[in-house]
């Protein structure tokens, strides 16, 4: 792409795309919840005994039936729990990709409270 030919509107947009768009694995809703729970667990400093999350109606609607990569499970409860119950490193929005090679079968939806 010839940057000299970009107009004044296109240049800032291209800058945003180049610097602010990051890779993500999975769908937005489960990833956002996994990222939030991972961040909370990081600041807590230990594995929480219980996870309680509050989400918007739109996130709930869009995320309840979404498959969480590497788990064979669907929904927001597994997305919220999987990072907290693992000991993997938070890698920005690739949080779920770090778990693909780990056993997540031990995470049972019976152990998860409904949102």
Curated annotation (Swiss-Prot):
Family annotation (InterPro entries): UPF0597
GO MF entries: L-cysteine desulfhydrase activity
One biological process term in Gene Ontology: L-cysteine catabolic process to pyruvate
PANTHER family with a match to the protein in the record: UPF0597 PROTEIN YHAM (PTHR30501:SF2)
Similarity-based family: Belongs to the UPF0597 family.
Protein name per the record: UPF0597 protein NTHI1023
């Amino acid at each position: 792409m010839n940057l000299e030919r970009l107009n004044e509107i296109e240049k800032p947009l291209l800058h945003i795309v180049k610097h602010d768009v990051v890779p993500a694995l999975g769908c937005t809703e489960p990833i956002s919840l996994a990222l939030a729970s991972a961040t909370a667990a990081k600041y807590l400093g230990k594995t929480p005994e219980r996870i309680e999350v509050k989400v918007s109606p739109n996130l709930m609607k869009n995320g309840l039936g979404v498959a969480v990569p590497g788990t064979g499970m669907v929904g927001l409860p597994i997305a919220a729990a999987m990072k907290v119950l693992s000991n993997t490193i938070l890698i920005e929005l690739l949080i779920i990709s770090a778990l693909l090679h780990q056993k997540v079968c031990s995470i049972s939806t019976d152990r998860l409270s409904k949102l």
